[in-house]
A protein has these predicted regions:
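Metal-dependent nucleotidyltransferase catalytic core
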Residues: 1-58
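Short secondary-structure boundary segments
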Residues: 1-9, 63-84, 123, 133-135, ...
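Generic preference for hydrophobic/aromatic residues in regular secondary structure cores
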Residues: 7, 61-63, 163-168
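Generic alpha-helix signal with a bias toward terminal, lower-confidence helices
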Residues: 17, 21-22, 35-37, 42-47, ...
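Internal, well-ordered alpha/beta segment that forms a basic, Gly-enriched binding/recognition surface
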Residues: 37-104
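Conserved nucleotidyltransferase catalytic core and NTase-mimicking acidic/glycine-rich helix/loop elements
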Residues: 86-169
Length: 169
């Protein structure tokens, strides 16, 4: 199997490097996100972010906390994270991106097969994450195929998983 370890480090000062990806073994990847503390204010902005908001709301493991900042921020973000307007907003971010990339896809056909295929797969990923955000958190590219069936079941659309597999195969 494979595993992703996501580590979010919140800094109280500007950061130079936003993201580091370190291959620990061929099967394990350490994905480190460096985020400035100011990004989390106001909390309603974080509720709209499918990646950062989800990192607070789906049982994160806290390694270090100074002054109860994390608990306060987590409670503030979770307070409205699952309200319909935020769920639809997060899903819409992925849906709109997939739609935009799809309209540009025909123009990329002449750029070469690797660019075209990469764009095609990104459209599928964004479409799947639009669905995933309706019931929970977005899926990483490494877990998308494995977990999409449960995402589709969560919104009572079991028919979506075979469609996804058909688009890939």
């Amino acid at each position: 199997g494979t595993a992703d370890v996501d580590l979010v480090i919140v800094h109280n000062q500007p950061v130079d490097e936003i993201r580091e990806i370190i291959g620990m073994t061929p099967e394990v990847t350490l994905d480190i996100h460096h985020i400035e503390q100011s990004y989390y204010s106001p909390p309603r902005k974080v509720r709209k972010d499918p990646w950062i908001g989800s990192s607070l709301c789906f049982d994160p493991l806290l390694l270090y906390n100074k002054g109860h900042w994390f608990e306060f921020m987590q409670a503030s973000v979770e307070a409205g994270f699952f309200s319909p307007e935020y769920v639809i907003h997060r899903s819409g971010l992925f849906s709109n991106e997939a739609r935009l990339l799809f309209t540009e896809l025909e123009n990329q056909r002449n750029l070469g097969s690797s660019i075209y295929i990469s764009s095609y797969l990104k459209i599928i990923e964004d479409g799947c994450n639009a669905v995933a955000c309706l019931s929970g958190l977005p899926l990483t590219d490494r877990t998308l195929m494995k977990r999409f069936n449960e995402v589709a079941e969560a919104i009572n659309r079991e028919d979506l998983a075979p469609i996804l597999y058909g688009l890939i195969l």
